[in-house]
Amino acid sequence: VVIVSGYFDPLHVGHLEYFQMASQLGDKLLVIVNNDEQAKLKKGESFMNEKDRMEIIYALECVDEVLISCDTDASVCKSLELVIQFKPMADLIFAKGGDRNFGEVPEVDVCEKFGIQMVDSLGEKIRSSSEYTGLKQI
């Protein structure tokens, strides 16, 4: 199972390419969508609410499962631990997009603790969602 995460607020072609590349790394693709509270921490408000982002992503052909993050900070550490509880026998891969590498994400410790394989810099950053919305990171 390949796991990816992000705000996807709004979803754009760079995200779609990220999902497609990640889905090729394993049998199933699970997308963790950062929740509305996390979006407020990042940008002060979200462009699209978590439910709408989740529904759009779930409709994509390359996506098998979608989970709204249960975390209260900017990470998805608790959400990854939740996935481990529900998929204890699965070989898990946590893949980050081209705009992130594991030197700058807090999920590294959880991945190392539970033996989750990590793949970073998947694809390249084409455009920021903030360019579409006008909302800037705070």
Regions found by a protein language model. Give the residues of each.
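Nucleotidyltransferase catalytic core that binds NTPs
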Residues: 1-138
